[in-house]
């Protein structure tokens, strides 16, 4: 399976490059056909420019090229994925931005944790908190920190679990809308959909919103340190309750909305995509690659606008502490090391990381990542609608 996985920065066969160029040419020609028709409707300049956004183009292309044949199970999973709501995703993200950048150790971080917990409880979840100590530097007095998670207990395999996560803290003095309000809102929107009383999951699902990612993945590391040894233990014996089900897979979401190319362009790039990363140099690389491929396949079936691609250099996010223990992947707007790390996002950790900075084409990239994750987990965890 690993032989099928190739990093996007490796050399590309000439025929693959030709196909890629032909696709881009086709997209450009398609925009030339559609844009004049819209302009005739006397729309504003901004509305006319929106026609060339990737979501509009890809929706039209899917209509031309046709869909992917689905099984009955795929169709049910599609019905579940369609319960995700774009406006709800945006409203959750907007709600998070009221707390500014949610920097760890600040009152706004604590208030955001409370708000996240209140939202999860309003959908019917019982929530828990991970408590840990954090010191900024060696020798500093450690201070208490907290992070929230909620669980949908599996109907037939409550002892096994997928972790769906993002980090709720940020920095930079803005609103941390993209880093990582976009991932946090994504996880919360999936949790909202799966809270419905008619949705059943065979395996347990945990929605974790990490704290202290920006200071070195401290919240996720604390979770692993405290709970890895608890996996699969029934407590009390015979109760059917598993405080920490055995980890089957871990899916992290970190910076989900900005793929404007590098050099950066004003609009979302025509070849924008959801990046799924695993770490080749990890103990669970083969299993992580398989999880990544499941997400790629789910994207092809369920995502409405943006494709997904797989690469093998996952880094600098909360799935890292898990990667030697369980299949672990990270979903992102760009590859972390080769694109984000090379200034592909000018708003990263800046005061401009604001809700108002992003367009619907940007929000849609994050929403398509939600479709991708929910579609994959629906199949892997055995999620279904009880009729």
Whereabouts are the PLM-identified features?
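Bacterial N-terminal signal peptides
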Residues: 23-33
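N-terminal hydrophobic or amphipathic helices/low-complexity stretches enriched
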Residues: 42-109, 113, 152-153, 340, ...
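Second-shell loop/turn segments in exported
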Residues: 75-84, 97-110, 134-139, 171-180, ...
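Structural recognition of the beta-strand scaffold that forms the well-ordered cores
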Residues: 89-97, 128-129, 147-151, 161-165, ...
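A non-catalytic alpha/beta surface segment that caps or lines the substrate-entry region
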Residues: 91-153
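Alpha-helical metal-binding/catalytic segments enriched in His/Glu/Asp
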Residues: 150, 164-217, 373
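Metal-dependent peptidase/peptidase-like ectodomains
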Residues: 210-318, 325-328
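Active-site-adjacent mobile loop/cap segments within catalytic or ligand-binding domains
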Residues: 258-281, 309-387
């Amino acid at each position: 399976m690993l032989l099928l996985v190739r990093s996007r920065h490796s050399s590309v066969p000439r025929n693959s490059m030709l196909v890629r160029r032909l696709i881009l040419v086709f997209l450009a020609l398609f925009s030339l056909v559609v844009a004049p028709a819209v302009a005739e409707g006397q729309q504003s300049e901004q509305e006319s420019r929106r026609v060339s956004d990737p979501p509009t183009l890809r929706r039209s292309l899917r209509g031309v090229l046709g869909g992917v044949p689905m099984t009955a199970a795929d169709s049910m999973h599609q019905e579940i994925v369609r319960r995700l709501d774009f406006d709800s995703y945006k409203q959750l993200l907007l709600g998070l931005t009221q707390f500014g950048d949610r920097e760890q150790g600040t009152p706004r971080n604590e208030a955001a944790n409370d708000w996240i917990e209140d939202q999860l409880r309003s959908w019917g979840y019982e929530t828990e908190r991970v408590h840990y100590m954090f010191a900024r530097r060696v020798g500093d007095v450690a201070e208490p920190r907290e992070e929230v998670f909620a669980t949908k207990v599996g109907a037939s395999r409550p002892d096994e679990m997928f972790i769906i996560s993002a980090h709720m803290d940020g920095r930079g003095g803005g609103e941390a809308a993209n880093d990582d309000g976009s991932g946090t809102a994504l996880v919360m929107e999936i949790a909202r959909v799966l809270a419905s009383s008619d949705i059943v999951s065979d395996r347990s699902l945990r929605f974790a919103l990490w704290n202290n990612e920006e200071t070195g993945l401290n919240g996720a590391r604390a979770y692993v340190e405290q709970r890895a040894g608890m996996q699969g233990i029934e407590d009390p014996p015979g109760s059917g309750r598993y405080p920490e089900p055995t980890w089957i897979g871990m899916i992290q979401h970190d910076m989900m909305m900005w793929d404007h190319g590098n050099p950066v362009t004003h609009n979302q790039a025509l070849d924008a995509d959801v990046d799924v990363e695993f770490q080749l140099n990890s103990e669970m690389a083969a299993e992580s690659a398989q999880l990544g491929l499941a997400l790629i396949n789910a994207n092809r079936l369920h995502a409405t606008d943006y494709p997904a691609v797989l690469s093998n250099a996952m880094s600098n996010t909360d799935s890292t502490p898990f990667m030697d223990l369980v299949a672990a992947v990270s979903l992102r707007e760009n590859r972390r090391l080769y694109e984000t790390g090379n200034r592909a996002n000018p708003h990263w950790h800046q005061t401009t990381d604001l809700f108002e900075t992003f367009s619907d084409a940007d929000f849609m990239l994050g929403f398509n990542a939600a479709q991708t994750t929910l579609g994959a987990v629906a199949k892997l965890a055995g999620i279904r609608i009880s009729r």
